[in-house]
């Protein structure tokens, strides 16, 4: 294959990915400006995994319910994504462990959105306690 062709495909993929991210972030900011129900804002904290958690932490200053879910989303998904990336470098076992971590991420993602929609302040194991401890002070 031609290196030029490979680099063109790679650049187009990254441009598409960056454009998609910017549209999604813009969409989230506009949704927050609409004055949504706090349960829906809690769900949106989990929508883009740790990215939406960080966005809601930066934009929401008052509501403890939303800040808790945003912090929990940010800490949980960023940590698990980093762990999955690091573990995947281990031959054979790393692939299995990384797959299991990614399955756990999807399960926590669904549970987090359901609990937030129901208005519950559900704490994930380990990460929920950390979020509970720090969500009030983070960037206030």
UniProtKB/Swiss-Prot annotation:
Q: Which Pfam families match?
A: DUF4870
Query: Where is it predominantly found?
Result: membrane
Q: Does the keyword Membrane apply?
A: yes
* Membrane topology term: Multi-pass membrane protein
InterPro entries xref list: DUF4870
Organism superkingdom:
Archaea
Membrane-spanning segments? 40-60, 70-90, 92-112
Compartments it resides in: Cell membrane
Swiss-Prot/TrEMBL keywords:
Cell membrane, Membrane, Transmembrane, Transmembrane helix
Cellular component per GO, a single term: plasma membrane
Q: Which family does the record claim for this protein?
A: Belongs to the UPF0132 family.
Q: What is this protein called?
A: UPF0132 membrane protein MJ1527
């Amino acid at each position: 294959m031609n290196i030029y062709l490979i680099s063109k495909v790679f650049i187009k993929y990254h441009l598409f990915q960056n454009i998609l991210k910017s549209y999604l972030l813009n969409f989230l900011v506009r949704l927050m400006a609409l004055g949504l129900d706090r349960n829906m804002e809690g769900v949106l904290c989990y929508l883009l995994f740790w990215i939406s958690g960080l966005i809601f932490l930066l934009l929401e200053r008052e509501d403890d319910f939303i800040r808790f879910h945003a912090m929990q989303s940010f800490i949980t998904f960023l940590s698990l994504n980093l762990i999955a990336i690091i573990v995947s470098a281990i031959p054979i076992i790393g692939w299995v462990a990384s797959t299991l971590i990614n399955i756990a991420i999807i399960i926590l993602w669904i549970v987090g959105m359901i609990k937030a929609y129901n208005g519950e302040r559900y704490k994930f194991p380990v990460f929920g306690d950390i979020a509970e401890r720090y969500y009030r002070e983070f960037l206030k």
